[in-house]
From Swiss-Prot:
This is Probable dual-specificity RNA methyltransferase RlmN. The gene is rlmN. PANTHER family: 23S RRNA METHYLTRANSFERASE (PTHR30544), RADICAL SAM CORE DOMAIN-CONTAINING PROTEIN (PTHR30544:SF5). S-adenosyl-L-methionine binds at G167, E168, S197, S226, L227, H228, N302. GO terms for molecular function: 4 iron, 4 sulfur cluster binding; metal ion binding; rRNA (adenine(2503)-C2-)-methyltransferase activity; rRNA binding; tRNA (adenine(37)-C2)-methyltransferase activity; tRNA binding. It comes from Prochlorococcus marinus (strain MIT 9303). Reaction proceeds by a ping-pong mechanism involving intermediate methylation of a conserved cysteine residue. Residues 106-340 form the Radical SAM core domain. It holds the Pfam family RlmN_N. It comes from the Bacteria.
Length: 356
C-alpha cells in the first residue's frame, strides 16, 4: 500500500474501515493504533479537518494536508427546517456541486434520506431532482458525509437510512454498497434499517444482488422499486426511461433478486391526482403483485411549483389503499413530511440555484 494514498487510491479518509485505516497508518510509518484513533475521530466525533484531530502527531497532520489528503466532509450551504422538525440540508462538494439530504424525525427514530448522485438522469416527470439532468455520481465519502452532517445538524443519531434523495442508486452501485458497508460497520446502523430505492435500470437488479452478496457478505438492506404505475403504457408516460425496461422484465428481475437474497421487495407507488390514483389502477396493481413476496408503499405526491400534477385528496388515497388491502396486498401509506420547507426531493437545490 502506498504511503501517500489511502485504500483504493482515494484522497478522503471518510468511508475507510478501521482495518483499512490501521494498515494505512502502518504504511505511513505510524503505529497501528493511530488508525484506530483516526477511525474514532472520523465516525464517533465527526472531525472535519486534520487540525481537529489533536491526538495525532502534528508533523503527520501537516504532511497529510500537504499531500492533499482530506477528511472528506462536505460544506453546509443552506438549511430548511419544517414545523415538524423535518430538516433538509443543501451540501456543497469540493468541486462546487450541491446535493440534498433530509432528516425525518419521529419520537422513536431519525430517518435520513440520502442522495447518490448530483442531479439525476432518469427524468421522472413528477420529480424535481431530474429537472437539471445528471452532473456526476457521488463518491463513497460524499454519501457517508450526509449522515454525519444530519447527525450534527439535528444533534441526534440517525437510526434509519433511505437512498431516496437525488440520483439513481443503481447507476452508482459500487459507491452505494461501499457506503452501506460503512454505515453498517463504522456507524453502527443495521442493514435492515437501510433502504435502497430504484426506478429500475435494465440489468442492474441481478448485478445488485450479486455484488451485495460479495461486498457485504449478505444483502439485508431493503430494496424499494419505484413502480408508480400498474402498466407499461402509463409507466412510460411518467418515467421516460421505462421504455427500455418492460414491466414484466422488471418484475422478473425483482423475483430473481428475492431468490438470490431472500429479501422481499418493496414496491413504491406515487399517487398523482386523476392520473394513476383511481380504483381501477389499484385493481390492476394488485393483479400485478399478487402472489409476490412484497409490500406496496403508497406515497402522496409532493407538489412542485411549475408542474401540472396534483396531490390526490385523502378520500381518494384511502380508497386506493383499501382496494389493495382487500385484494390481499400488504400496503402502507408513507406520511408526507416537510411540505412547508421545500423538503420534497430536489426542490431546495432548485430554489438555491435560482437565487444564485
Amino acid at each position: 500500500m502506498s504511503s501517500t494514498h489511502l485504500p483504493g487510491g482515494n484522497q478522503a479518509l471518510l468511508g475507510c474501515s478501521a482495518t483499512e485505516l490501521e494498515s494505512w497508518a502502518v504504511a505511513e510509518g505510524q503505529p497501528a493504533f493511530r488508525g484506530r484513533q483516526l477511525h474514532d475521530w472520523l465516525y464517533a466525533k465527526g472531525a472535519r479537518s486534520f487540525d481537529a484531530i489533536t491526538v495525532l502527531p502534528k508533523s503527520w497532520r501537516i504532511s497529510l494536508q500537504q499531500r492533499g489528503l482530506t477528511i472528506g466532509r462536505l460544506l453546509e450551504v443552506n438549511r430548511a427546517v419544517a414545523v415538524d422538525d423535518t430538516t433538509k440540508l443543501l451540501l456543497a462538494t469540493v468541486d462546487g456541486e450541491t446535493i440534498e439530504s433530509v432528516g425525518i424525525p419521529t419520537q422513536q427514530r431519525l430517518t435520513v434520506c440520502l442522495s447518490s448522485q448530483v442531479g439525476c438522469p432518469m427524468a421522472c416527470r413528477f420529480c424535481a431532482s431530474g429537472k437539471g439532468g445528471l452532473q456526476r455520481s457521488l463518491a463513497t465519502h460524499e454519501i457517508v458525509d450526509q449522515v454525519l452532517s444530519l447527525r450534527e445538524a439535528m444533534d441526534r443519531r440517525p437510526s434509519h437510512v433511505v437512498f431516496m434523495g437525488m440520483g439513481e442508486p443503481l447507476l452508482n452501485i459500487e459507491a452505494v454498497l461501499a457506503s452501506i458497508r460503512c454505515l453498517n460497520i463504522d456507524l453502527g446502523i443495521a442493514q435492515r434499517r437501510i433502504t435502497v430505492s430504484t426506478v429500475g435500470v435494465p440489468h442492474t437488479l441481478p448485478q445488485l444482488a450479486e455484488l451485495a452478496m460479495k461486498r457485504l457478505g449478505r444483502a439485508q438492506f431493503t430494496l424499494a422499486v419505484s413502480l408508480h404505475a400498474p402498466n407499461q403504457e402509463l409507466r412510460e408516460r411518467l418515467i421516460p426511461t421505462a421504455c427500455a425496461y418492460p414491466f414484466e422484465t422488471l418484475l422478473q428481475d425483482c423475483r430473481h433478486y428475492l431468490a438470490v437474497t431472500g429479501r422481499r421487495v418493496t414496491f413504491e407507488y406515487i399517487l398523482l391526482g386523476a392520473l394513476n390514483d383511481q380504483p381501477q389502477h389499484a385493481e390492476e396493481l394488485a393483479e400485478r403483485v399478487r402472489g409476490f413476496q412484497s409490500h406496496v408503499n403508497l406515497i402522496a405526491y409532493n407538489p412542485i411549483d411549475d408542474e401540472g400534477f396534483q396531490r390526490p385528496n385523502p378520500e381518494t388515497i384511502e380508497a386506493f389503499r383499501r382496494v389493495l388491502e382487500q385484494r390481499g396486498v400488504a400496503v402502507s401509506l408513507r406520511a408526507s413530511r416537510g411540505l412547508d420547507q421545500n423538503a420534497a426531493c430536489g426542490q431546495l437545490r432548485r430554489q438555491h440555484a435560482a437565487i444564485g
